[in-house]
Structures are given as C-alpha cells and as structure tokens.
Amino acid sequence: MEITFLCAPAENAQFPGQTFDVVTACQCFPYFRHEELAKHLHTILKSDGRFAIMYMAWLPLEDRIAAKSEELILQYNPDWTGCNEVRRRIGIPDAYDAYFTLEEEELFDIAVPFTRDSWNGRIKACRGIGASLSEAEIEAFEKEHRSLLQQIAPEEFEILHYAAIIVMRKKPGLD
C-alpha cells in the first residue's frame, strides 16, 4: 500500500472532491478554523462520507495519581490551561450544521493502563510540559515527577479517563 504523507493545515489540504469515505480528528478539533474546515470537509468527503471527532482526557478530580501529576505540572507551568478536565460532550460549532448531520455521539469512561515510566512519558508529552517548557525545565520536571510516582504509584496502575466520540454524516446535495 502506498501512502503519501502530507503536512498541511486541515482547512486547505489539497485533495480532489469526494476523495475520502471518512475523515477523523482526534484531540485536535478545538484548534481548527471551523468556518473553513466544515465546507472543505464536505467537499473532500464522498457522498455518504463521515467526519468522526474523538477526544480523550484523564480525570484528575477522580484519579489521585492524575491529580498529583497535574499539581506538579502547575508548579512548573502555572499558566497551563489543560488541567482539571471533567467529562464533557464535544462542542460542535454551528459552522458544521449546513454541511453535516449528527449520526452518533458517545461519552464513556475508560481505565487506561500505565507503568510509572509510561505515565511519566505521557505527562512529559502534554502541552503543559513538553510543548511549553525549556529543556532544562523539562529535565527538572521529569526528575521530580519520577520521584513523585515512586512515592504515590505502584509500578503498574490505571488512570481514569473519559472518551467522547461524535460521528457526523455529510449532507447530500451541496456539492
């Protein structure tokens, strides 16, 4: 199978009309320019095409290890806005109403297995640390986070997350 890798803003990725059966967006949906994207997706999806949106987050108000990790993130990055997640539906901007109909929506809990090392890696990769801090700050955070995990977490554990999924079907007759 030949797969072409393309790095481009979703709103103007160049594909012929009616190319895809399904387009997915996982974790990135809030960052799009929705007025542009809704129309563009409608164009590149086949006549019975779907747009699936997924989001997943740990629940620090219900999971002690996640809460302690977030507390440490906030010590290093007090301006981080990705904290204190709670279960919520994916908000779909009105721009999609003209082009799509809601077909399915689900919200559910999932216990995600981690080791101390994999949880440290997951936290280090979050935008509050890996995308925001200097290399020296990341190293200091990681040292402190690993020490914290030694104190509060067994070698293997689960972190409570919620997942939200929406599937929208392309409206006919607008091409």
Residue ranges and their predicted role:
Residues M1-A13:
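Class I SAM-dependent methyltransferase SAM/SAH-binding core
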Residues L6, T24, A52:
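Conserved Rossmann-like nucleotide-binding pocket used by diverse enzymes
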Residues A10-N12, P30, W58:
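Active-site micro-motifs of SAM-dependent methyltransferase domains
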Residues E11-V23:
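A short acidic, Gly/Pro-enriched loop at the edge of an enzyme's catalytic core
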Residues V22-C26, H34:
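A short beta-strand submotif of the Rossmann-like class I SAM-dependent methyltransferase core
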Residues Y31-L41:
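A short, conserved alpha-helix within the catalytic core of class I
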Residues H42, K46-V112:
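Conserved catalytic/acceptor-binding region of the Class I
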Residues R89-D175:
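Conserved Class I S-adenosyl-L-methionine
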